[in-house]
Amino acid sequence: MASVSALTEELDSITSELHAVEIQIQELTERQEELIQKKKVLTKKIKQCLEDSDAGASNEYDSSPAAWNKEDFPWSGKVKDVLQNVFKLQKFRPLQLETINVTMAGKEVFLVMPTGGGKGLCYQLPALCSDGFTLVICPLISLMEDQLMVLKQLGISATMLNASSSKEHVKWVHAEMVNKNSELKLIYVTPEKIAKSKMFMSRLEKAYEARRFTRIAVDEVHCCSQWGHDFRPDYKALGILKRQFPNASLIGLTATATNHVLTDAQKILCIEKCFTFTASFNRPNLYYEVRQKPSNTEDFIEDIVKLINGRYKGQSGIIYCFSQKDSEQVTVSLRNLGIHAGAYHANLEPEDKTTVHRKWSANEIQVVVATVAFGMGIDKPDVRFVIHHSMSKSMENYYQESGRAGRDDMKADCILYYGFGDIFRISSMVVMENVGQQKLYEMVSYCQNISKCRRLLMAQHFDEVWNSEACNKMCDNCCKDSAFERKNITEYCRDLIKILKQAEELNEKLTPLKLIDSWMGKGAAKLRVAGVVAPTLPREDLEKIIAHFLIQQYLKEDYSFTAYATISYLKIGPKANLLNNEAHAITMQVTKSTQNSFRVESSQTCHSEQGDKKMEEKNSGNFQKKAANMLQQSGSKNTGAKKRKIDDA
């Protein structure tokens, strides 16, 4: 009869092999998901091509984009003349001519084009080539003001109506809408105007009857759909326009929309058949990078200042912040260290916003430190860097905000600082949104990924097929020459669940910070669990592990609402039950090391030349002197943003 020790040894061997098999299953499952995603995208494209082919056989014009990329339509001569003599442009960008031809033919079209691709021209130019006026629906007054400023410089007659418009101005616009001799070509309104102003709708009817109202342009059309990243209820009322004015052609524009969102928007706008032109999401001149956000504020500012004084010396940029308070504090810190910076957020007085915008456009200010209120319609071509002080609330938002860099098609950098605490600051803000948390976790997954091409991650989100080799080492992950492996972190999850169960029994709620403290053997003694050994990993890597468990649903967020704030707590998630199976394994990708280590690399740029480093070192001298005084006054130690190599417990 076999001895107990021999049986135990065999059992351990089987358990070990089961863990290895579980890890292989997870790797294969990930690969399966990638292939399923590619299959879905390709199937949709084939279906779209077949539908376009069928539609082309029965329509007056072929519905494939290539068929509309022509200059032999009745309006083509006028279109070219307006392009060159009014807009002062010599040629169209990709999909602009196709979209213009479709809308000039009186057909409905949706255009999905990256930020900076020139969507505005696709309805502004046709407005000048058509009789009557085009009604433009925009979500933000600031966006309308930006566009009107540019149109005025080009000598194009355009105006807007909003709640602050004077009675005299409203009266003039209403008269121009039905005046057959009017030169007014573009009228900008917010969706609220359509939803709530019966007087304006009445005026539109009269203009339509007089054949003066010829086209509807819905900017940021993704706002129609509750599945979009920026859903606005008043956009749902826009369906009335096609019902009331069926002969006015409609063009919808967005930089960020999935197929699901576009289909939903089409239904909401009451469009039966619609062309959809989608430009590639790829901006080949943009370099994407994710950096570990230093926990120390002084370290963080040091990192940013070294970049601005080094690689971006004398170059224009934007720093996006989570809140108005962050925007103002970062601006003050940068100014104290000699950077010409200006804050921009929604609560600034209109004249202050205009001043900051004007000075930045004229390069009198090097950096705008802004909230998301800054950017829509911003058309500064030479923005060399966009830095995210905190991550965006969704992939769509990040794509749009980072896309404000490099509109001149020259190389530009998009650097995102990822910090654990930001997850919960943002989740508390988006908790009431329909898919807010889901979209945030997609963004967290993007930031946590240390190996996949950033463009591949974006492509998967926007339903595109992408070959990582086409990135040309224009993202941090594609620049790495490290090897990666999957580490088994199952026991960490079991320990965290023990801590959360004990807290639940004590009727205690644990914030993410309290959970980490308890795990590390710190904080209140009653929240610690006997038998849970504190891991020897640094705190920032424990944060990454908890974030991994959160987006994999082994943990979940719960919220408490107070009069002043929404507080996020962590609880046991729906997938935690899988741990009842002893063989179940949870793995996390880490950088492979020759030693038995758990190493999470902070991303480093690879595209910049050696001169960048020298420039940063050269220009950091003044910074160090100024920073030393600031740090001495605050009594804080400047430890620097370090790359860490972590020994696995």
UniProtKB/Swiss-Prot annotation:
Any GO BP annotation: double-strand break repair via homologous recombination
UniProt keyword annotations, A-Z: Acetylation, ATP-binding, DNA-binding, Helicase, Hydrolase, Isomerase, Metal-binding, Nucleotide-binding, Nucleus, Phosphoprotein, Zinc
Binding site for Zn(2+): 453, 471, 475, 478
Protein name stated in the entry: ATP-dependent DNA helicase Q1
Basic and acidic residues biased stretches: 609-619
Bias (Basic residues) ranges: 640-649
Entry function: DNA helicase that plays a role in DNA damage repair and genome stability. Exhibits a magnesium- and ATP-dependent DNA-helicase activity that unwinds single- and double-stranded DNA in a 3'-5' direction. Plays a role in restoring regressed replication forks. Required to restart stalled replication forks induced by abortive topoisomerase 1 and 2 lesions. May play a role in the repair of DNA that is damaged by ultraviolet light or other mutagens.
Entries under SMART domains matching the protein: DEXDc, HELICc
Name of the encoding gene: RECQL
A GO cellular component entry from the record: cytoplasm
UniProt similarity note: Belongs to the helicase family. RecQ subfamily.
Positions where N6-acetyllysine occurs in the chain: 514, 522
Gene3D superfamilies documented for this protein: P-loop containing nucleotide triphosphate hydrolases, Winged helix-like DNA-binding domain superfamily/Winged helix DNA-binding domain
Enzyme Commission code: 5.6.2.4
